[in-house]
């Protein structure tokens, strides 16, 4: 069984889509998924009325207390998880990771996972120039205009060893399938 640590940041952009995809993949591939939320993710997830959805589907939601609590780093480094998925990732989280700042649960866990060669996958919606259409609570559409600095930070992530940037929520399934194949060969 594939074991995934799923980090959620305070990014509302594409959050409903990511949650739906993770629910589908968990059931389709019988995944073992533990969710770790940043402090702001808790606020945003509740604003989108997705807290109960996550709790019903994934049971145990762990919310950041500080950069080391809950102790995700230890679980990543001791092999409890096959991969660390951060989706969606805020522009702030992306910038911190791009510049080596590890002062939150998610950014510290990414840094430490990389040091232990645990595969890290990050979906930052701000990943290319132009616009992104997202859905707000109440199904209202919002067009976001990407800032050059955010796109540049995503490009920095793409060049980092140990991180794979996902361009869209649908890319998560490709990652899952790749790791399922690896597990079969072990």
Curated annotation (Swiss-Prot):
Pfam families: Flavoprotein. Coiled coil: none annotated. GO terms for biological process: coenzyme A biosynthetic process. Gene3D superfamilies: Flavin prenyltransferase-like. It comes from the Archaea. GO terms for molecular function: FMN binding; phosphopantothenoylcysteine decarboxylase activity. One of its GO terms (cellular component) is phosphopantothenoylcysteine decarboxylase complex. To M.jannaschii MJ0208. PANTHER family: FLAVOPROTEIN, HOMO-OLIGOMERIC FLAVIN CONTAINING CYS DECARBOXYLASE FAMILY. NCBIfam families: archaeo_AfpA. This is Uncharacterized protein MJ0730.
